[in-house]
Amino acid sequence: MKLRIKVKPNSRTDEIICEADGSLKVKIKAQPVEGKANKYLVEYLSEVLNLPKSKIRLLKGESSSFKTLEIDSEENYVNDRLSMFLKHSQS
Protein backbone atom coordinates (compact mmCIF):
# COMPACT_ATOMS: atom_id res chain seq x y z
CA MET A 1 0.00 0.00 0.00
CA LYS A 2 1.08 3.60 -0.51
CA LEU A 3 1.04 6.13 2.31
CA ARG A 4 1.38 9.91 1.86
CA ILE A 5 2.56 11.81 4.90
CA LYS A 6 4.02 15.13 5.92
CA VAL A 7 7.14 14.79 8.06
CA LYS A 8 8.28 17.33 10.64
CA PRO A 9 11.86 16.50 11.61
CA ASN A 10 13.75 17.93 14.59
CA SER A 11 10.68 17.58 16.85
CA ARG A 12 10.76 17.06 20.61
CA THR A 13 8.88 13.77 20.39
CA ASP A 14 8.02 11.11 17.85
CA GLU A 15 4.31 11.09 17.11
CA ILE A 16 1.74 10.58 14.38
CA ILE A 17 -0.95 13.24 14.07
CA CYS A 18 -4.18 13.23 12.12
CA GLU A 19 -4.67 16.77 10.82
CA ALA A 20 -8.10 18.40 10.60
CA ASP A 21 -8.23 17.64 6.85
CA GLY A 22 -7.57 13.92 7.49
CA SER A 23 -3.95 13.95 6.34
CA LEU A 24 -1.18 12.38 8.40
CA LYS A 25 1.76 14.27 9.88
CA VAL A 26 4.64 12.39 11.45
CA LYS A 27 6.84 14.27 13.90
CA ILE A 28 10.27 12.75 14.43
CA LYS A 29 13.24 13.67 16.61
CA ALA A 30 15.86 13.16 13.89
CA GLN A 31 17.48 16.11 12.14
CA PRO A 32 17.05 16.52 8.37
CA VAL A 33 20.77 16.12 7.66
CA GLU A 34 22.31 13.71 5.14
CA GLY A 35 19.21 11.48 5.00
CA LYS A 36 19.14 10.86 8.77
CA ALA A 37 15.49 11.90 9.05
CA ASN A 38 14.43 9.56 6.24
CA LYS A 39 16.28 6.64 7.81
CA TYR A 40 14.82 7.45 11.23
CA LEU A 41 11.32 7.76 9.72
CA VAL A 42 11.54 4.22 8.32
CA GLU A 43 12.85 2.92 11.68
CA TYR A 44 10.06 4.69 13.59
CA LEU A 45 7.31 3.45 11.27
CA SER A 46 8.81 -0.04 11.44
CA GLU A 47 8.31 0.02 15.22
CA VAL A 48 4.82 1.52 15.02
CA LEU A 49 3.67 -0.93 12.34
CA ASN A 50 5.54 -3.88 13.84
CA LEU A 51 7.06 -4.63 10.43
CA PRO A 52 10.67 -5.13 9.34
CA LYS A 53 12.32 -2.01 7.89
CA SER A 54 12.68 -3.90 4.60
CA LYS A 55 8.88 -3.73 4.20
CA ILE A 56 8.87 0.10 4.21
CA ARG A 57 10.31 2.00 1.27
CA LEU A 58 10.50 5.71 0.48
CA LEU A 59 9.12 6.25 -3.03
CA LYS A 60 9.00 10.05 -3.26
CA GLY A 61 10.09 13.04 -1.23
CA GLU A 62 13.67 12.26 -0.30
CA SER A 63 14.42 15.97 0.25
CA SER A 64 10.85 17.17 0.83
CA SER A 65 8.65 17.23 3.91
CA PHE A 66 5.91 15.52 1.85
CA LYS A 67 6.72 11.86 1.40
CA THR A 68 5.19 8.86 -0.30
CA LEU A 69 6.02 5.51 1.24
CA GLU A 70 5.32 2.02 -0.01
CA ILE A 71 4.47 -0.39 2.78
CA ASP A 72 4.49 -4.08 1.96
CA SER A 73 1.53 -5.09 4.12
CA GLU A 74 -2.25 -5.26 4.07
CA GLU A 75 -3.93 -1.85 4.15
CA ASN A 76 -6.28 -2.84 7.00
CA TYR A 77 -3.33 -3.96 9.14
CA VAL A 78 -1.44 -0.70 8.52
CA ASN A 79 -4.51 1.43 9.27
CA ASP A 80 -5.23 -0.50 12.48
CA ARG A 81 -1.63 -0.14 13.70
CA LEU A 82 -1.52 3.58 12.83
CA SER A 83 -4.80 4.24 14.64
CA MET A 84 -3.28 2.84 17.85
CA PHE A 85 -0.62 5.60 17.79
CA LEU A 86 -2.67 8.42 16.26
CA LYS A 87 -3.15 11.77 17.94
CA HIS A 88 -5.68 14.22 16.58
CA SER A 89 -4.79 17.81 15.73
CA GLN A 90 -6.13 20.52 18.01
CA SER A 91 -6.75 22.88 15.05
Which residues fall in each region the model found?
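N-terminal first-folded block
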Residues: M1-K27
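Non-catalytic surface loops within mature trypsin-like serine protease
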Residues: V7-P9, A30, S73-E75
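C-terminal structural segments of small proteins and small subunits
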Residues: R57-S91
